[in-house]
């Protein structure tokens, strides 16, 4: 076996099981991942263990299989710029058009956050026998509205922020669940996490988190909240954290936030 395809959850399990040291993986030449955002901190550890053999693809059922690619050469860790780029999902493939739009459809410049919209040869023309759904999810110029929030940098690399529907609004501030999850997942005791917004009388919503520990590791909710406050704005830190044995996963291995 020289190539594997995996979602980040599977890669986290490979880390926990210390596979490079317990199994002969010398034939493995490529690890292709995608399906959900990966923790940059864990990706750095994976690169140390496996080397620069990772390739990330970003796509959807509506534009299958991939729209952007973060190739092997983009998985360097020698400079701050390279490490920062590990947070991206790469650049559009030839023929693919990716734009970032405001709510009114205005195309935003590099660095500004908005909805990711996609048009290309592998993007569907519409939903079968569903004209209203097609009208809702496609712009007049044929761009599919992904529902993903993100931004592009000056070099054309695309960065995912979160699903539009998963944004938490607490005290008037926007909090993206993936940003808090990445912070939690950077803690050495955490295997994976899920962050949600729950109703709150004063703040509108409050940030809550559920975490799954690496086998044999210990920590406490208070320690994890403090960890978040050290690395994020205080309003983004979870108000409560619950340590659980298992996070709900889809058949593809994605964490199902709405079932937490």
Question: PLM features: residue spans?
Answer:
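Beta-strand->loop->alpha-helix junctions that form or flank phosphate-binding loops
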Residues: 55-62, 90-92, 196-198, 242
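Alpha-helix capping/helix-boundary segments
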Residues: 10-11, 38, 123
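AMP-binding/adenylate-forming catalytic core of the ANL superfamily
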Residues: 4, 120, 125-126, 133-136, ...
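Active-site glycine-centered loops adjacent to acidic/histidine catalytic or metal-binding residues
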Residues: 35, 59, 90, 148, ...
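AMP-binding/adenylate-forming core of the ANL superfamily
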Residues: 97-99, 110-124, 143, 149-150
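Short Gly/Pro-enriched turn/cap motifs at secondary-structure boundaries
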Residues: 86-92, 107, 138-141
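Core-facing hydrophobic residues within beta-strands of well-ordered domains
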Residues: 25-28, 190, 238
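Gly/Ser/Thr-rich phosphate-binding loop
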Residues: 1-6, 15-84, 97
């Amino acid at each position: 076996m020289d190539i594997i395809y995996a979602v980040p959850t599977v890669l986290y399990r490979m880390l926990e099981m210390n596979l490079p040291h317990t199994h002969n993986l010398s034939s493995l030449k490529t690890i292709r991942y995608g399906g959900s955002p990966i923790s940059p901190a864990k990706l750095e550890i994976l690169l140390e263990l496996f080397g620069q053999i990772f390739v990330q693809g970003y796509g959807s059922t509506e534009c299958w299989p991939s729209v952007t690619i973060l190739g092997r050469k983009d998985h360097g860790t020698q400079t701050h710029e390279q490490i920062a780029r590990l947070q991206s999902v790469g650049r559009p493939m030839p023929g693919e058009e990716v734009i970032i739009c405001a709510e009114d459809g205005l195309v935003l410049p590099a660095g500004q956050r908005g909805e990711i919209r996609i048009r290309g040869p592998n993007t569907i023309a519409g939903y079968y026998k569903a004209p209203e759904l097609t009208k809702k999810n496609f712009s007049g110029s044929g761009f599919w509205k992904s529902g993903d929030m993100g931004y592009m940098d000056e070099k054309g690399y695309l960065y995912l922020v979160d699903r539009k529907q998963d944004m938490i609004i607490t005290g008037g501030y926007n909090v993206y669940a993936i940003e808090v999850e990445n912070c939690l997942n950077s803690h050495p005791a955490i295997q994976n996490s899920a962050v949600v917004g729950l109703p709150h009388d004063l703040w509108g919503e409050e940030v809550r988190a559920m975490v799954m520990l690496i086998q044999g590791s210990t920590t406490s909710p208070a320690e994890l909240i403090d960890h978040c406050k050290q690395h994020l704005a205080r309003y983004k830190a979870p108000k409560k954290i619950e340590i659980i044995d298992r996070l709900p996963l889809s058949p593809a291995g994605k964490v199902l936030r709405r079932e937490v």
